[in-house]
Amino acid sequence: MSHDLETPPGEPGRWAEQLYRARGEAIPRWRPVFTGDVFDAAPVTTSSGTTAGRTVMVLQHPCAMRTDGVNLATRLLVGEVSHHRVLTPEEWRGFTKLMSLPDLNSSATSRKRHQAVVFDRLEVVDSSALDVGRRLACLTHAGVNLLLQRRVHYDTRVVVTTHDIQAVTGGVYEEADIIEDWCEAASLAGIETSLATEDCVAWLRADLGGGLMRQRMLEDQQNRSGIRRAARAETVKRY
C-alpha cells in the first residue's frame, strides 16, 4: 500500500503551531540540540573554500546526535535554510527536495518570514560552532517526524508514515524532553546545564537490575509518563 507525503494537521495558516516547539527567544537555553533545530550564522565552508555564516537546520538523525548521550558528535549533518514562499497542501506533497518552514521568522514582515530547508544543499559543520544563543527554532515531535519522512523520501523515494517514524523516534525525543525539564530545575539551583545533563543521562542509564535502564524503557510508550514523573521527583530531591 502506497502513502502520500503528509502535511501538518489543521489549516495551512496554523501549520506553524504544529511544526515548531518554540522559536527565537522562547526556546529554553537548556533545550538539548536536536534534529530539526534551526541555527543562524553557522559557519559553512563555501565552494571557494571561504567560510560564511549560513542559516542551517540540523538533519542528523536523533540516534546519531551524541556519542555518549551527553556530548554532541564532533561533526553534524545540516541542510541550508533559505527564503521560500509558503506551500499549499497540494504543493507540500510535491516539492520533495525541501521542507517548508512557514513563519520561521514570525516577526519579519519581508520575504524572510517564510523559509525552507533544502535537502540538496547539505553541509557537515563542527557541532561546537552551533551557538544555542543563535537557535531560531526547535521542531515539535510531529515536526521532526515530518522532516524525517521527507528526508527518507528524498533519498529513497519511499514514503514511511509518520506513525512508523514515531515508533522509532518517540523514546529519544522523550529523553530530550526529560533532559530539558531536568536542566531547567537544576538551573534554579544554580547548576550549569552541562553538569545537569550529565546527571540526568547518568540517572537515565542507571542499571535497575538485569541490565534494564530507564533510557531503554523510554522506547516503550507505556513507560514514558512514569519515567517523567520519576525524573521530576528526582530533581526535587536533588535540587
Label each PLM-derived region with a short phrase.
Residues 2-70:
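Short N-terminal edge-element motif at the start of the domain
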Residues 46, 63-64, 83-85, 105-106, ...:
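Generic "edge-of-domain/loop-turn" microfeature
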Residues 43, 60, 80, 103, ...:
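Pocket-edge structural micro-motifs
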Residues 50-53, 58-97:
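Compact nucleic-acid interaction/catalytic patches
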Residues 2-6, 17, 50, 89-239:
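C-terminal terminal-subdomain/extension
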Residues 23, 76-78, 147, 151:
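Generic hydrophobic, helix-prone segments enriched in Leu/Val/Ile
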